[in-house]
Each structure stands twice: as C-alpha cells, then as structure tokens.
C-alpha cells in the first residue's frame, strides 16, 4: 500500500479525530496565507516545531486535505506500528542520532517522498528535526532540501516544486485551550531558484542558499527571538513590554511581539554592557515572578523594576 493511496478509513478518521482534538485543545485556530499554497506544482510544507502532537494536527486541519507527514524513524521499528503510521500517511525520516547506517536508508525515503509529490500530495516536514516550546528556530536539517532538489531534478521540467515556509504560534505553550495561529508564507519556487543559480554555485552551496532562504522566511512568520544565550531574557522583556496592551487578536499579538522584539534586540545590541545588566534584571524578575505565580499579563509598570526595564528598552 502506497502512503498516498486514497483510503476512506483515513478520511473518516481525519474528520472524526483531528477536528475534535483541535476543538478540545485550542480555543481558537487562526489560519493565514492559504492563498500562498501553490496549485500548479508540488508542495512541501516547511514549518517550525514547538509541539509534538498539535503541530501536525494544526497543519492537517488548516490544509483540510490529506497531507503526508515526515516523522522520526524510531517509531516505525515495529512492523505493526509501521502499518499504522503508513495508514496515517506518515513516512519515517532517519536522523544522525539514529546512526550512519540508518541515515543511508533516507535515500529510499527520499524516493518515496518524490513519488508522493509527483502524485500531487502535499508533503509536510519540520526541518528543525525536533520540537521545543520556544519562539525561535534551531538550525534546519538538510532533508527537506534534498527532497525538494531531487523532486525538481526528476520532474521540475513538467511542474514546479515549491517549499512553503510555515509558522505556527501558540498564545501560551502550557495553557489548555490557548489560541494558535498558522501562517503560510510566500512559497520558494525551488525550480526557479535552481534555474537562476545552476552553474554559478556548487550543489552544496545551492542547498545552503535554500536553507538560508527558508530559515529567513520562517522566522518572519513567528514572534522570532534569535536563538542565543540571551533568548530567555529577551522573551521575558517582550512579555513585560507588551503586558499592558489592549485585547488583541492572536495575529495582532504576533505583530506586537515582533515589534517589541525588534526594539529590544536593537537597543541591547547597541550597548552590550548595559544589555547584560538588563538581561540580569529580567531573569531575576522572571525568577521572582514565577515563585509568586504571577503571569506577565498581571504586571504593571508601577513596579519599580518593571518601570526601569520599560524605560531602558524605551517601549
């Protein structure tokens, strides 16, 4: 049985399982940018990954059609589970941690992925290769680009191959029935990208350029905080500086957070020495706030420390 074969059982399960889980888990799901999903070629979804269970379901719900997902290979080890996950339209992908011999099996997996794309089924991957509850991005693995480039090599002359940058944002990672926003960005036309750069750069450089472009576009779709040692302090500052904003829609909240993050990064990068003191204050405040079980939205600038932080960042 091919993973992309039509199956009435899967269709029923998707409607009876995905929709109720989303409705129970989320208060509201906002979908933006569906007009960016190409209709004239092969579509690969490349999304950030912050929740192991909900992220695939959010994409599946927002796509509203059968979508093939790549997932870690270790859950496919038992034959029975392999059949179950194939029925659920999932394919394994091997990672370095699985061992070199296992990674070599990805050549066959890439062939299957290309076959999926040839049959016009969307393929969804989380190129960070693991999940974590952070408003940031880890380095993107090469698998998504190997698949896209191989698909383009095999049938790019017939129809274009696209990678669609996707961002998933949750209002609160650890709160039951929070809001979620999934945003589909402008697609990367891999076929056109290869045509523009072929012969000018090596295959390795071409892949690296695609990697940089996807990472940049993904970061623009979420409340992105650079993944550095200052992440925790910067995100705490962001929450404090936006705590007193009026009620906003989930999408408006992302825009507000992005603006605050940009100001914080600009301000702290311009004065690294002062930034270290500010980060220390922010982390100390976070520790005290959590001990007292106070959410950032409950804070106000009347508190001298918060006032000091707010004035320093000049928001």
Listing of model-derived features with the role each one plays in the protein:
Residues 31, 78, 107-110:
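Structural motif corresponding to alpha-helix initiation and N-cap regions
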Residues 3, 97, 102-305:
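Non-catalytic C-terminal accessory region of glycerolipid acyltransferases
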Residues 33, 71-72, 89, 126-127, ...:
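A secondary-structure boundary/capping signal
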Residues 306-315:
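Alpha-helical bilayer-embedded segments of polytopic membrane proteins, i.e.
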Residues 24-31:
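Short gly/ser/thr-rich secondary-structure transition/capping motifs
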Residues 27, 65, 86, 159, ...:
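Residue-level signal for beta-strand positions within conserved beta-sheet cores that form or flank
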């Amino acid at each position: 049985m091919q993973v992309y074969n039509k199956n009435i059982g899967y269709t029923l399960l998707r409607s009876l399982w995905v929709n109720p889980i989303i409705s129970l888990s989320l208060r509201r799901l906002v979908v933006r940018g569906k007009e960016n999903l190409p209709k004239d070629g092969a579509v690969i979804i490349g999304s950030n990954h912050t929740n192991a269970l909900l992220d695939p379901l959010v994409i599946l719900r927002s796509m509203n059609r059968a979508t093939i997902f790549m997932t870690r290979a270790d859950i496919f080890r038992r034959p029975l589970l392999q059949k179950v996950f194939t029925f659920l339209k999932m394919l394994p992908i091997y990672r370095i941690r699985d061992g070199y011999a296992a990674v070599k099996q990805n050549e066959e997996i890439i062939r299957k992925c290309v076959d999926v794309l040839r049959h016009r089924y969307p393929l969804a991957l989380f190129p960070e290769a693991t999940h974590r509850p952070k408003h940031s991005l880890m380095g993107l693995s090469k698998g998504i680009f190997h698949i896209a480039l191989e698909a383009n090599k095999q049938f790019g002359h017939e129809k274009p191959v696209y990678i669609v940058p996707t961002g998933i944002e949750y209002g609160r990672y650890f709160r039951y029935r929070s809001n979620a926003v999934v945003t589909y960005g402008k697609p990367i036309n891999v076929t056109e990208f290869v045509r523009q750069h072929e012969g000018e750069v090596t295959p390795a450089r071409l892949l690296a350029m695609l990697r940089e472009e996807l990472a940049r576009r993904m970061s623009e779709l979420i409340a992105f905080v650079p993944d550095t040692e200052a992440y925790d302090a910067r995100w705490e500052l962001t929450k404090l500086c936006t705590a007193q904003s009026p009620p906003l829609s989930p999408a408006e909240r992302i825009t507000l957070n992005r603006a605050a993050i940009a100001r914080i990064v600009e301000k702290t990068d311009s004065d690294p020495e002062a930034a270290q003191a500010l980060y220390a204050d922010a982390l100390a405040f976070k520790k005290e706030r959590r001990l007292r079980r106070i959410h950032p939205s409950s804070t106000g600038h009347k508190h001298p420390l918060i006032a000091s932080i707010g004035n320093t960042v000049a928001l």
